[in-house]
C-alpha cells in the first residue's frame, strides 16, 4: 500500500501564511478529520530540544503549534502539548522557544514527560524493555511536529528521530548507553520508538531549517517548505529525495527497510520533488563510517575511524551542561579544563547537542578526513 507525503511552500512564519499552508498540506493527504475525531485527546509532540529563541531554528516554531492547535479544535479534538527536553524543564524550554506563549494564548496544556512505562504489549521489536512516557500511550492521537535539522550522530533529525522525546529524561541516557558506539543500534532504538508511538500525523517544520552541526549548534537556513504525512518514515524518505541523497543515507530509513517498514513507492502531493529540491545544504561532519573491519581492529583504530567531540576553549562558558548529560560520564571538569576520556566516549554527541554556546566541535579522525577527500560522505 502506498503512503502519501504533501509538500507545500510557505515563505515565512507569518501566522496567516502558516495556517493557510497547514490547511493545504493536510487537505492534500485527506484533511484533518482523517486523523482527528471529535472528542479525541490529541498529543502535539514538537521538537523542544532546548530553550532557544525561534529564530535559532532549534525548536519547532510556535506558529506551527498555534496553527495545529486551531485545526485540531476545528475537528473537535482536545489538544495538549508534550515533550521531554534534553536540558532543563519543559516550562523553561517552552518559555524561551515561544511555545509557552502560544500554549497560554490558546489555553492548551503543557505536559512534561516524566512517567516512564514499558507498554503493556511489550517494548520495541529489538529493545524489549524500552520505556515510553505513559502520557504518550494514553493519548488517542499523536501528531508529530518535528523540525528539519541536521544531527551530529544521526545525520538528520526529522519525523522518526523527533519521537525520541517520548522517552522521559534520564531514560534517554540509558538508550545511548544501550546502543554504545554503534549508530545503527541507536537507529534501531529510534525505529522501535516509532513502532510503539505510531503517530497518526507528522507535520515537518521546514520553513526555516538547520544545517551544519545540528541539532543545537548549526545554522538556520530558509527552506520554505512544510511537509505532512500519515507516515513519518515516508516523510523522512522524501526529505532525503529533496536533499539529493540516497534514502538509506539516513540510518533510521536503512533500519526501517531492513525491518520491511519502509515503502519504496510514495505518492508526493502538492509540490514536485524536482521543482523544490534543495540546491545548497551543509550536512554535519561525518561521525563514523562502517569500514567492514574486524571488531578488534575497529576498536584499536577507534580514534582514526570516528569523529570525536572537542571543546572550543575560547567559546566555552564552563556551564558544565555537557558533563551533566554525558551518558558514559566520559567528560569531566578538572579545574578550568574540560577533559574527554575518548576510550569511554561513545560518540553520541549529546555534549554538542546541549551546549548553549556551540562550544563543542566535531573533530574527524585521520581516516575519516582521508575518506572525505575522495568521496562525498553525504551520498551513499
Tell me the role of every PLM-derived stretch.
Residues 1-313, 317, 323-337, 342, ...:
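N-terminal and secondary-structure boundary signal
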Residues 346-347:
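Extended, alpha-helix-rich binding/interface surfaces that flank or overlap catalytic cores
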Residues 376:
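Helix-rich C-terminal "cap"/substrate-channel and partner-interaction subdomain
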Amino acid at each position: 500500500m502506498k503512503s502519501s507525503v504533501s509538500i507545500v511552500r510557505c515563505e515565512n512564519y507569518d501566522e496567516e501564511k502558516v495556517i493557510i499552508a497547514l490547511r493545504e498540506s493536510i487537505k492534500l493527504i485527506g484533511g484533518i478529520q482523517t486523523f482527528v475525531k471529535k472528542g479525541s485527546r490529541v498529543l502535539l509532540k514538537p521538537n523542544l530540544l532546548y530553550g532557544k529563541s525561534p529564530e535559532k531554528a532549534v525548536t519547532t516554531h510556535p506558529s506551527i503549534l498555534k496553527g495545529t492547535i486551531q485545526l485540531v479544535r476545528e475537528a473537535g479534538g482536545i489538544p495538549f502539548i508534550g515533550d521531554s527536553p534534553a536540558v532543563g524543564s519543559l516550562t523553561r524550554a517552552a518559555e524561551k522557544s515561544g511555545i509557552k506563549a502560544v500554549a497560554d494564548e490558546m489555553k492548551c496544556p503543557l505536559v512534561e514527560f516524566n512517567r516512564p512505562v514499558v507498554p503493556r504489549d511489550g517494548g520495541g521489536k529489538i529493545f524489549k524493555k524500552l520505556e515510553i512516557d505513559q502520557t504518550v500511550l494514553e493519548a488517542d492521537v499523536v501528531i508529530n511536529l518535528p523540525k528539519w535539522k541536521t544531527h551530529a550522530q544521526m545525520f538528520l533529525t526529522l519525523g522518526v528521530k523527533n519521537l525520541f522525546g517520548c522517552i522521559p529524561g534520564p531514560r534517554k541516557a540509558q538508550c545511548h548507553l544501550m546502543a554504545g558506539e554503534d549508530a545503527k543500534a541507536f537507529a534501531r532504538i529510534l525505529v522501535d520508538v516509532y513502532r510503539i508511538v505510531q503517530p497518526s500525523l507528522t507535520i515537518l517544520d521546514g520553513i526555516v531549517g538547520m544545517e551544519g552541526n545540528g541539532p543545537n549548534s548549526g545554522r538556520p537556513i530558509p527552506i520554505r517548505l512544510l511537509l505532512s504525512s500519515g507516515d513519518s518514515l515516508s516523510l523522512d524518505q522524501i526529505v532525503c529525495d529533496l536533499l539529493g541523497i540516497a534514502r538509506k543515507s539516513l540510518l533510521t530509513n536503512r533500519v526501517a527497510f531492513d525491518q520491511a517498514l519502509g515503502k519504496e513507492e510514495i505518492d508526493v502531493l502538492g509540490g514536485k520533488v524536482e521543482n523544490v529540491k534543495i540546491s545548497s545544504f551543509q550536512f554535519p561532519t561525518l561521525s563514523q563510517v562502517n569500514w567492514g573491519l574486524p571488531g578488534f581492529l575497529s576498536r584499536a583504530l577507534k580514534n582514526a575511524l570516528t569523529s570525536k567531540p572537542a571543546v572550543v576553549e575560547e567559546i566555552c562558558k564552563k556551564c558544565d551542561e555537557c558533563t551533566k548529560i554525558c551518558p558514559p560520564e566520559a567528560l569531566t571538569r578538572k579545574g578550568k579544563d574540560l577533559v574527554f576520556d575518548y576510550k569511554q566516549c561513545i560518540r553520541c554527541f549529546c555534549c554538542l547537542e546541549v551546549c548553549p554556546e556551540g562550544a563543542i566541535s566535531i573533530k574527524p579522525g585521520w581516516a575519516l578526513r582521508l575518506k572525505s577527500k575522495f568521496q562525498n560522505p553525504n551520498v551513499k
